[in-house]
Amino acid sequence: ADVEAAAHGAVAGAIINGGQDCTAATRAYVQAPLFDACTARVAELMDAVVVGDPTDPDTGLGSLISHAHRDKVAGFVDRARASGAQILAGGVAPGGDLAAGAFYRPTLVTGAAQDSEIVQDEIFGPVLTVLPFTSDDEGIALANDTPYGLAASAWTRDLNRSLRASEEIAAGCVWVNDHIPIVSEMPHGGYKASGFGKDMSVYSFEEYTNVKHVMMSRDTAAHKEWQDTVFKQR
């Protein structure tokens, strides 16, 4: 994969809308030989994000929806830290002029267990957890090891690997070398605990349609042929 492109995509996908997005990138699996370089670049990009007033054109991340939600997000990170995970970027609420708001720094977590809550649960905050994988089989298995299945992305220069990932990752939307953009012509919906049905595209029409079956018989006989199974004609 292109580490620079993947790092930018991961950071933007994790913190867009404050991470308060159903399709946000909340966890990433990086091939082991690229792990250190990728996490270092992600941390660098996160540290460079300007947190503050969303009306300021220089701001890259504004406030979360409420103080209660900010505290919930911080709780995930604090518990991960207490369980032995490493926080390579963020992990704190900014002070100074922003101390009174519901702000939280873009956060990068590594060293978390696959079955930990920060990997398995939806955080809805600007938090990205990164874990290594050694083979495509393992990477796809880890990606699918979650109760959710709304969105995923695969970052690779190899066409065959991208086709395999997009086919085998159990998510309703899979991007290749991007994350987040959605167009109205394409269906949007998930698998597993992410629900069923689709919005957007022609598939969404069914979600707004009450389908009714009306059948009128033109057979005037009192005894219909299909009723023979009940009335047992001799």
At which residue positions do the language-model features occur?
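Conserved C-terminal structural/oligomerization subdomain of aldehyde/semialdehyde dehydrogenase
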Residues: 50, 77, 100-234
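ALDH superfamily catalytic-core signature
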Residues: 1-113, 142, 176, 223-224, ...
